[in-house]
Amino acid sequence: MKHFTAFLMSVLLTGPAFAAPATAPAPLPGDSVYQLAATLTDQDGHTAPWAARRGTPQIVSMFYASCTMVCPMIIDTMKATRRAAGEPAALGLLAVSFDPARDNTDALRRYAAAHRLDLRWWTLAHATPADTRSLAALLGVQYRPLPDGDFNHSSVLLLLDADGRIVARSTIIGRTDPAFVAAVRQLAGAQP
């Protein structure tokens, strides 16, 4: 028994030296939007780097929670697109606010509840004003505040692959874009 205990101790103490080294994630592709060093805070108050979205394809857009016209249509179009694509499990839905002054964690949580967003797939997020501007520029979303607190803004849905490359873009809001849905199906079908 002494020999077995000594043998077991030597294996336990030297085993880590022979273990396979942990592999670092592959570098991001040069055209990945995750190259941007921004931080997002979600509707549950969790803060993470923008690049933490890596690993799962995403439909991404920008909005603001107090919008009563176009932004609900953006959210509904994202929902409808996911449904039309067969509700793939390997697909995240991310809407980032460009009104960080008002769209805090509580406002985003209330918005998610009011719009019945399934938080298994959905993330509503806000960032610092500087990160919001950088993210909007990167995604090609234009916005400007109006004196009454509303915003003029463009409306776009982007499909990102797991590494953050833009695979498809759609400006069709209020109904599904067949080409965009096809791109979602193709990308989500390619995932393990």
State what each model feature region is.
Residues M1-F4:
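Positively charged n-region of N-terminal signal peptides that target proteins for export
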Residues A6-P16:
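Bacterial N-terminal signal peptides
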Residues F18-L36:
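N-proximal helix/coil linker or "cap" segments that precede and/or mark the start of modular domains
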Residues L28, Y111, H115, W121-A125, ...:
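Soluble extramembrane regions of membrane proteins in the secretory/endomembrane system
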Residues A38-Q58, R82:
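A short beta-strand-turn-helix
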Residues W50-M78:
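Short active-site neighborhood of thiol/selenol oxidoreductases, capturing the structured segment around
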Residues M73-L135:
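Structural microenvironment flanking redox-active thiols in thiol-disulfide oxidoreductases
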Residues L146-P192:
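Thiol-/selenol-based redox modules, centered on thioredoxin-like
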